[in-house]
Amino acid sequence: TSRRHLLRSAAAGFGWLAFRGLAADAGGAPTPAGTPGESTGRPAIRHHRATARRVIFLCMQGGPSHQDTFDPKPRLRRDHGKPGPGRGRGTQLVGSPFAFRQHGQSGLWMSELFPHLSGQADRLCMVHSMRTDIPNHPQAFTQLHTGSARFVRPSLGSWVLYGLGSANENLPGFISISPPAQLGAANYGSAFLPALYQGTRIGSGREGSSEAGMSHVTQGQFTTGQQRRQLDLVQAMNRERLDGAPGAEPGGGAIEAAIQAGELAFRMQSEVPDLLDLGRESAATRALYGIGETGVDGFARQCLLARRFAEAGARFIEVNLGGWDQHQNLEAALRKNARALDRPAAGLIADLDARGLLDDTLVLWGGEFGRTPDSRQQDGRDHNHRGFTVWMAGGGVRGGTTHGRTDEYGAQAIEDPVHIHDLHATLLHTLGLDHERLTYRYGGRDHRLTDVHGTVVRAVLG
């Protein structure tokens, strides 16, 4: 019987499904095993004391308007309808239609759009001076996730998993829930890092969050013993190819990563199905996130899944909420987005705190850029990469504080600007990772998430 025939026979079992589903992207010629983070079961690297053990990234695809959410601009409101500054003829200033007020003991300013999230004001650290390099969605979104707008690079979650390893051998360490399909898998991919560090996708932007799941996690046709034997057959052929080649076989690291991915997929059967079952949560917890509420349910499910995976040991969990690209219909569209975000995000922070997880979980909220103060259409805003807002909570950041400032219209950062490389450096710092020392050798040089840039923003750290 030929190997090809045996492989086809094994394809009916979970082992081959795991190999295809979780390791299909294992490409390139990565550094051989033995580099930092190669085994997800190893102890985490710590370059210094960590204040966070995991990250939950609330990713707002489209570019949320900072002037209408967290960065009030009274002058912009007063000058509504006047000619816009510095972007050529035909634009007019657009004042925010939403009222702002201060919240919590810190007096943090927030829009009326967030009645629930404003209750967490004293836990939020607002960075009002973010900037990035390109005002186009695909490039800016990729830079947000990988640090580079031009080249294929490992994603932020992959770097975190590479540095820390997994805290639970039965789970993927990097989860991306409902990522936007149109912007590509590179935003949760591992690029030249071993495929073991790529993100595991749950659902996609094309399907509702209530239907999101992992394909082939369980295989009801076969017993666990049968699945184990079939996977062993596939793995034996993989190892024969890996071990039988003279010297270091090109792509050998990819084969090793595929072997480990297959083993992980097999182990996932014991834990992942229960984690995906939100019916195991109490009615009170589900209500806290807004599950079952019209216009809220989808993102609420994502946030609750994020908490469950964080609690179970995942290192980096990204949840996605798109639709923030409001070139027109600003007021109605922003109300819809804010409603979807408000209760789930507030519930996530409150739930993490109640379970003792917030102190060592960094929650990051933000999009690929912000919005301009002016537009050619009076009911929208255009892309703005020169100044916008992100916020963080937990994980050792200073709650109830703001950092940086944009000008009186919110057009650009004018005080303590924070580049995306600085944000990445700061995030890694909270995890105990030095962004200058977390490197991977590929193509003849050492690569890092921040390339040759990045400064830790120590002012936001507690």
Regions found by a protein language model. Give the residues of each.
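Ligand-binding pockets and gating/stacking loops
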Residues: 1-462
